[in-house]
Amino acid sequence: MAHDMHSGDTERRILDSARRLFAEKGYEKTSIQDILNDLGLSKGGLYHHFKSKEAILDRLNADEWAVTARLLDKLIEHKDMSALEKLRVLIVSAVDAPDHLDLVRSQLALLKDPAFFTANMRFWSTRLPESFRSLIDMGVQDGSIPTAYPEEAAQLLSLLGNYWLMPCFYPADHAGMEHRIRCLATMLDAIGVPVFDETLILRTAEGLTALTPEEDTVSA
């Protein structure tokens, strides 16, 4: 048991170091040796956990996905909520939960790295839409999401929500962010996915505006 705990600690240290170095130097410019030097770890110690730098990057992305997957599993089990309500809870968890926002904030600099950005785009275009699609399909069945475009709606939420709404890509002040979210809400309403009510619009604008990098802050 003690060995397992130590092994887990080492793995977490590797991930924390890699996340920081990838953000500071860029993924391509960070070598395995840089991570080893930062931790004072042997090659064998690192390769016991991760076979390559790419494996570390994949794990960093998987960790974020795991948080969403756990919440999705819990939501699906709830029988006293409509699918539309569950979808709103899932979105709130992404834009209003301090732990998740801290994780996103820690990775913003990494998104400037082409390799990390590409890995995230793969996630946003494949696995994340699957999460939204499962709830949208449930909404079609229970009548709370009367859409004829479940696949397209899942893709819109995933790609626009994680790219177009992100202030690190498209800077905006609070008013500009709220206006943008209302635009997305209008698009989704038009295809029968009325997920963004007034409360969710305001909470989403608040959470995403807080992610604006200081150097990119837009003056009102």
Please annotate each region the language model reported:
Residues 1, 130, 134-141, 173-220:
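C-terminal peripheral helix-coil segments that are non-catalytic and often amphipathic
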Residues 24-28, 79, 142:
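Short coil/turn segments at alpha/beta junctions that flank glycine-rich nucleotide-binding fingerprints
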Residues 59, 63, 70-104, 154-157:
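Hydrophobic alpha-helical connector segments
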Residues 96-144:
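Short secondary-structure transition hinges
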